[in-house]
């Protein structure tokens, strides 16, 4: 809106008085910084008089006037009539405040009413610097709300107002560097909200604002780097504030002196996985890739830990010296990759620096130790199958432990097989306590049934048996329940399952496929119609086996109800195999019962047979280990079944992941 000198004089006449220079209110909480004019087009805003006094930028003295609900609602709705009401009532607009300390300009800026903001600025320029109870200026409020046009208008107004004053008078009046109660500037809110156009306007208005940190030690520059590729050009504009001819060390010193809070910009770029921003930072300040963060990690270690392959290669292309720089905990970048199971990064390290595979941490552990210790089974598997790293399996740390020792200590059954089967020498090695991996497993396994411990022990013993290193009589040991009450609940659950199987199979025996001969004129009245059908015979055979096995299970488990621990163990050793057998016979009986009825439909017969066969095998590999690992004696030859079960688990997990992915895609499309 345009105005003349006469209009400004009219507005000045409406004011009761002007405060003097020594009565002004100090609104700055962060020190003054000179401003530069913003670039880019902005909305036209009221022009200030060239002879603007400092007193024009501060509110009238006196107490605040409580904002009425009518004025609050009207300003929130963008109604200019509210200003006229305030004028007609003689209410000083500068003193009208809500219960949260918001001025009328705060409210108009919060809801993005551009024209109302312009008019308020024209009449009350002092409100540009007014802060609410949260120490936020209208510029804070507008940026937080994401109103770019309003922000541009406020920035242009502030720049015009300060330009009309002398340098001495304008010092300390820069709202671009004012911080709210959380220590955030308006620029921080713009970047946090990912408003690129708005952030660019604010950066152009004040080049020092991006370096100010909040109460959490996060600066606007840090937040811009964390925003990723979208803010690449803005980060470049912020960092390109010095002459290229200045020495890099001097530029780095200048950056450190200006940047408040967290200074690990390269780490943040890696976290954001923004290769463009990383290039901007390292091109301008190459030494940042050698710095360590608050956890003592170099850029390479941090990139390896999060698995950012492109960023890590970018750093390695610049320099590989960081590969041999350890963190504060004594680990090298290649150890971070092994710990977090990023095998492709390990390969990249070894490709560029072959000697890095021999690096040891403070515990004397190599990458295979670290992988085994942290249950990174896939990494351990790949390293043991690589001829260049396979020999690391016999390495011993400061305690004499091999990777296999550490895997056993952590009961990592996934790593056991590859570590023990790919290098038989590892089975013979003893640590400084004189213990082999087998000794640790057998001594540390708990007496009560804990699946992953007994599973690990069984796989280790099978690997020893397969290698021929020493004899193994059994893959399991006797388990003793610690709580008889919990064991009784387990027995009761088995009784319920066995009773259900017996009931279902008993009923199925009298509702056979094809029914019975009901015609009195035909021979064999009341006999099965398909009695001579071989598939019906198989149906009846497995149905009877399932029923009889379940009944035998019930009879056996009745003994377990007496509470005698020895009887419980012996009953379970008999009942569990019987129940497993009955559960497997039941689906076979069902399959042949269906085949009897639909044998003439070939395609349906094949489909049902394939589906049933798959789930039958799945049931074997799910229920089998549960029964086998509870037996006091399991011959070593059973180990092949356990290894196959491991493969089944991996396939099942992959199948579940695929199903989730498919349903996720369907959900996204909907």
UniProtKB/Swiss-Prot annotation:
It is found in: Cell membrane; Endoplasmic reticulum membrane. Changing residue 498 to T: In E27; suppression of acd6-1-conferred phenotypes and increased P.syringae susceptibility. Changing residue 591 to F: In acd6-1; gain-of-function leading to SA-dependent spontaneous cell death and increased disease resistance. Stronger accumulation at the plasma membrane. Changing residue 508 to T: In E35; suppression of acd6-1-conferred phenotypes and increased P.syringae susceptibility. Residues 1-456, 514-537, 599-602, 660-670 are cytoplasmic. Induction: Accumulates in systemic uninfected tissues during Pseudomonas syringae infection or upon benzothiazole (BTH) treatment. Induced by light, but repressed by dark. Accumulates upon MG132 treatment, a proteasome inhibitor. Target of endoplasmic reticulum-associated degradation (ERAD) when ubiquitinated. Ubiquitinated. Sequence variations impacting defense responses are observed between cultivars. Enhanced resistance is correlated with a substantial reduction in vegetative biomass. The dominant gain-of-function mutant acd6-1 and over-expressing plant ACD6-o is dwarf and shows spontaneous cell death and increased disease resistance, as well as increased defenses and better responsiveness to salicylic acid (SA). These symptoms are SA-dependent. In acd6-1, constitutively high free and total SA levels leading to collapsed dead cells with adjacent enlarged cells in the palisade parenchyma cell layer. This phenotype is absent in NahG background, in which SA is degraded. Strong accumulation of camalexin (an anti-fungal compound) and SA in acd6-1. This is Protein ACCELERATED CELL DEATH 6. It comes from Arabidopsis thaliana (Mouse-ear cress). The lineage of its organism: Eukaryota, Viridiplantae, Streptophyta, Embryophyta, Tracheophyta. The gene is ACD6.
């Amino acid at each position: 809106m345009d105005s003349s000198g006469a209009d400004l004089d009219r507005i000045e006449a409406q004011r009761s008085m002007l405060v003097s220079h020594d009565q002004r209110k100090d609104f700055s909480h962060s020190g003054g910084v000179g401003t530069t004019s913003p670039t880019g087009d902005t909305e036209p805003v009221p022009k200030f008089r060239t002879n603007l006094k400092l007193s024009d930028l501060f509110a009238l003295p006196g107490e605040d006037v409580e904002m009425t609900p009518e004025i609050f609602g009207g300003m929130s709705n963008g109604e200019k009539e509210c200003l006229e009401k305030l004028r007609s009532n003689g209410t000083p607009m500068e003193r009208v405040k809500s219960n949260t300390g918001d001025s009328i300009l705060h409210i108009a800026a919060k809801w993005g009413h551009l024209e109302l903001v312009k008019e308020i600025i024209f009449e009350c320029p002092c409100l540009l610097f007014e802060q609410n109870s949260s120490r936020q200026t209208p510029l804070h409020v507008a940026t937080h709300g994401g109103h770019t046009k309003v922000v541009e208008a406020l920035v242009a107004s502030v720049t015009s107002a300060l330009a009309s004053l002398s340098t001495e008078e304008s010092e300390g009046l820069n709202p671009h560097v004012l911080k709210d109660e959380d220590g955030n500037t308006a620029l921080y809110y713009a970047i946090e909200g990912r408003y690129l156009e708005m952030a660019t306007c604010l950066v152009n208005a004040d080049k020092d604002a991006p370096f100010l940190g909040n109460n959490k030690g996060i600066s606007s520059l840090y937040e811009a780097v964390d925003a990723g590729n979208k803010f690449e050009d803005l980060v470049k504009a912020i960092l390109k504030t010095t002459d290229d001819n200045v020495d890099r060390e001097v530029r780095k010193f200048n950056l450190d002196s200006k940047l408040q809070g967290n200074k690990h910009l390269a780490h943040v770029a890696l976290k954001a996985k923004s290769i463009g921003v990383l290039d901007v930072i390292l091109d301008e300040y190459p030494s940042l890739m050698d710095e360590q963060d608050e956890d003592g990690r170099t850029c390479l270690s941090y990139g390896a830990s999060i698995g950012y392959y492109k960023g890590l290669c970018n750093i390695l292309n610049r320099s590989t010296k960081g590969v041999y720089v350890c963190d504060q905990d004594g680990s090298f970048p290649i150890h971070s990759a092994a710990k977090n199971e990023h095998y492709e990064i390990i390969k990249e390290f070894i490709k560029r620096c072959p000697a890095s595979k021999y690096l040891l941490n403070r515990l004397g552990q190599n990458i295979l130790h670290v992988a085994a210790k942290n249950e990174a089974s896939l990494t351990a598997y790949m390293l043991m199958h690589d001829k260049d790293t396979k020999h690391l399996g016999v390495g011993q740390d400061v305690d004499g432990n091999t990777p296999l020792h550490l895997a056993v200590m952590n009961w990592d059954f996934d790593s056991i097989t590859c570590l023990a089967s790919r290098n038989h020498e590892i089975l013979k090695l003893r640590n400084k306590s004189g213990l082999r991996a087998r000794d640790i497993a057998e001594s540390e396994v708990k007496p009560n049934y804990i699946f992953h411990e007994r599973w690990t022990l069984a796989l280790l013993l099978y690997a020893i048996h397969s290698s021929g290193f020493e004899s193994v009589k059994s893959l399991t040991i006797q388990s003793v329940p610690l709580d008889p009450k919990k064991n009784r609940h387990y027995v009761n659950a088995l009784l319920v399952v066995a009773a259900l199987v017996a009931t279902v199979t008993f009923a199925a025996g009298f509702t056979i496929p094809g029914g019975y001969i009901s015609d009195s004129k035909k021979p064999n009245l009341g006999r099965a119609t398909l009695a001579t059908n071989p598939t019906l015979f198989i149906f009846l055979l497995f149905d009877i086996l399932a029923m009889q096995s379940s009944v035998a299970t019930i009879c056996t488990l009745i003994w377990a109800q007496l509470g005698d621990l020895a009887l419980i163990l012996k009953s379970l050793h008999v009942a569990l195999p019987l129940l497993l057998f009955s559960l497997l016979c039941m689906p076979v009986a069902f399959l042949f019962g269906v085949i009897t009825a639909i044998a003439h439909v070939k395609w349906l017969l094949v489909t049902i047979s394939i589906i049933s066969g798959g789930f039958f095998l799945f049931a074997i590999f799910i229920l089998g280990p549960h029964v086998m690992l509870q037996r006091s004696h399991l011959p070593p030859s059973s180990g092949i079944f356990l290894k196959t079960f491991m493969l089944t688990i991996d396939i099942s997990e992959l199948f579940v992941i695929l199903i989730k992915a498919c349903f996720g895609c369907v959900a996204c499309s909907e």
